[in-house]
A protein has these predicted regions:
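Conserved beta-strand signature within the Rossmann-like core of class I S-adenosyl-L-methionine
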Residues: 34-43
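Soluble non-cytosolic domains of exported or imported proteins
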Residues: 14-21, 52-59, 95-96
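Mature catalytic domains of secreted/periplasmic carbohydrate-active enzymes
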Residues: 23, 66, 71-77, 96, ...
């Protein structure tokens, strides 16, 4: 089993972190033991409200996933060092090439 959550977790998290947690918990019920959720989203600035920029901090996503009971692994595959995280993801200068985290959330066996 696999589910992909692509660049949407911030939309659940920023207005209400509990809403994002509930989404992950609901997705978890759809997975067999050992099933995975792939999560990618735009990296935000630590200690800042990232909602206007449509971003979130990587650690926020990891904390949510662990709180939902997933085993979490991360990858640097989608990192983009030219993105300074201070612009909206819709800023034309970024050309949608944002710095993104990539997480593998696995439902325990």
């Amino acid at each position: 089993d696999a589910v992909i959550v692509a660049q949407t977790l911030h939309d659940y998290y920023n207005p209400n972190p509990d809403r994002a947690l509930n989404m992950l918990l609901q997705l978890k019920t759809l997975l067999k033991p050992g099933g995975v959720i792939g999560v990618t989203d735009h990296i935000g600035i630590a200690g800042r409200d990232n909602s206007d920029m449509h971003r979130m901090q990587t650690q926020q996503a990891i904390d949510l996933a662990e709180q939902a009971g997933f085993d979490v692994e991360s990858s640097e595959l989608l990192r983009s060092p030219s993105d300074d995280h201070s612009r909206s993801i819709f800023d034309p200068r970024l050309n949608r090439n944002t710095d993104r985290f990539l997480l593998k959330l696995q439902k325990p066996l």
